Amino acid sequence: MAALGWLPGIRIDQAESWEDVGIIKEAVNLAEEKATAKTSVLLEETRIFEAPKDLAENSNVMKWMKEKGFKTEREMRLWCSANYIQFWGEMAKTYADWFEPWSSTLEWKPPYAKWFVGGKCNVTHNCVDRHAQGAKKIRWPYIRA
């Protein structure tokens, strides 16, 4: 019989009595409960991390909200929830550079999701390179090793 998963060296076929089998099973159950408890605690995040007000007010999302004519952030959020495919398509077109356009914003076949099907972009270009060009270029510090 194989070892019980992540309890190295504990094998039911090495148990000398039914009592040993019971102890091994109990140890496995306790370990599984402990692992589940840790996982469920991590899934219950309730903290909210708010951006500084000036940063939030000047963000790309707020700029987009004003361009689209939404009066409140709540109104925009409700629209985005109902139209999430259109929202993410517009965000990707507006705020990322693409080397090849996508044919479909989302292909959803549970449990699989494919975003921006057929599109090609370069993460380094979008996160670093394009910010080092133009009027708003970021001056990157030179780091010596």
From Swiss-Prot:
Q: Which InterPro entries match?
A: ACAS_N, ANL_N_sf
One of its Pfam families is ACAS_N
Give the protein name, as stated in the record: Uncharacterized 16.9 kDa protein in acs 3'region
Which lineage do the record's taxonomy fields give for this organism?
Archaea, Methanobacteriati, Methanobacteriota, Stenosarchaea group, Methanomicrobia
